[in-house]
């Protein structure tokens, strides 16, 4: 921990504290400051001018990151009949209703669950297990659908879900430190464009209040929010 503390401080010295950088500069700086021995995730933290206590100011949605997430997503599809083959052909890792019992028994070796609407009655019984882990299928996220082929392809191809927390912040990954700068820039733009479009009509005043970017272990860099106003 002491060594990591020194590395963190050394990395922090490469940025100008209190300065807001253009996105391109900030991304380059985050890549430069990354010091962990593993391929760190590059994460965005956005503070929004909303009050999530009011239902009409909750910001949530999905976006397909053009350059992907850098993570191999394990996709589970709960479906029957022809939808089983459709999901398998689309590349799902696990398919079938038998996995519901496995989940009840403690199995959770997947990252995304997709379900056809007719299966949600059974899946709802697993809410206490799936909900806190962010694994519950949701129509708004496109994971409750009869078009399982599209849902699987999107999940495998870089689709992420975001939701504002109680403090008015959105946290989301945009790739890995090993990504090329232009890949991270493209993913960042896709995320920001989606969040800007998701501004609630009830939100008043400045919407995008602060944006910071960091690697998993590295210090944060503030991004200039002027382009998003």
From Swiss-Prot:
Q: Which residues cross the membrane?
A: none
Which molecular function terms from Gene Ontology are attached? rRNA binding; structural constituent of ribosome; tRNA binding
| InterPro entries attached to this UniProt entry | Ribosom_uL1_bac-type, Ribosomal_uL1, Ribosomal_uL1-like, Ribosomal_uL1/biogenesis, Ribosomal_uL1_3-a/b-sand, Ribosomal_uL1_CS
GO CC annotation, single: large ribosomal subunit
Q: Which Gene3D superfamilies match?
A: 3.30.190.20, 3.40.50.790
Taxonomic superkingdom: Bacteria
Biological process GO annotation list? regulation of translation; translation
Keyword RNA-binding listed? The answer is yes
Keywords attached to this Swiss-Prot or TrEMBL record, sorted alphabetically, are: Repressor, Ribonucleoprotein, Ribosomal protein, RNA-binding, rRNA-binding, Translation regulation, tRNA-binding
Description of how the protein assembles with itself and partners: Part of the 50S ribosomal subunit.
PANTHER family linked to this entry: 54S RIBOSOMAL PROTEIN L1, MITOCHONDRIAL (PTHR36427), LARGE RIBOSOMAL SUBUNIT PROTEIN UL1M (PTHR36427:SF3)
Q: What does this protein do?
A: Binds directly to 23S rRNA. The L1 stalk is quite mobile in the ribosome, and is involved in E site tRNA release.
Q: Which family does it belong to?
A: Belongs to the universal ribosomal protein uL1 family.
Q: Specify the protein name.
A: Large ribosomal subunit protein uL1
Q: Which gene encodes it?
A: rplA
